[in-house]
């Protein structure tokens, strides 16, 4: 289990136990230590890892990330101007460096989002998407 995941679990525990001030203090420390913004109310599944301690990652508080995902540095997940809803990431997903996942988007299980991809639409299970806007490159076998 990597450091940022443990840090987030502490923030999340404080938040769910209505210790919001302490959760926000820990969040502020995490921004300084890890140069990442992972809000305490965010749901992150067990086994998810952030290599490079999520350096430069920014997430909206209501984004949901499934189990056993790998999220590389510089990833942004959040809202999209003029659209309602936020990203939901399935299980066993790899999100490449500096990818952006924006709006009411679901990333399917066992999928890969390539480095620098801009995801604006749902991604099915078991595929690799790349580009701006992200398009299916191939199946992920």
What positions do the PLM features span?
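Terminal amphipathic alpha-helical/low-complexity segments used for targeting or macromolecular assembly
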Residues: 1-36, 134-135, 141
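Left-handed beta-helix
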Residues: 34, 40, 45-46, 51-52, ...
């Amino acid at each position: 289990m990597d450091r940022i995941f443990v840090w987030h679990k502490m923030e999340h525990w404080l938040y769910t136990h209505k210790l919001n001030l302490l959760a926000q203090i820990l969040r502020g420390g995490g921004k300084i230590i890890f140069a990442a913004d992972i809000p305490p109310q965010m749901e992150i599944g067990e086994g998810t890892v952030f290599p490079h301690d999520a350096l430069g990652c920014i997430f909206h508080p209501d984004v949901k990330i499934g189990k056993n995902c790998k999220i590389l540095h510089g990833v942004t997940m959040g809202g999209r101007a003029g659209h309602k809803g936020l990203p939901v990431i399935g299980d066993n997903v790899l999100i490449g460096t500096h990818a952006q996942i924006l709006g009411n988007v679901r990333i399917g299980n066992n999928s890969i989002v390539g480095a620098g991809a801009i995801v604006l639409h749902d991604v099915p299970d078991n595929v690799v998407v790349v580009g701006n806007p992200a398009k299916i490159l191939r199946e992920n076998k």
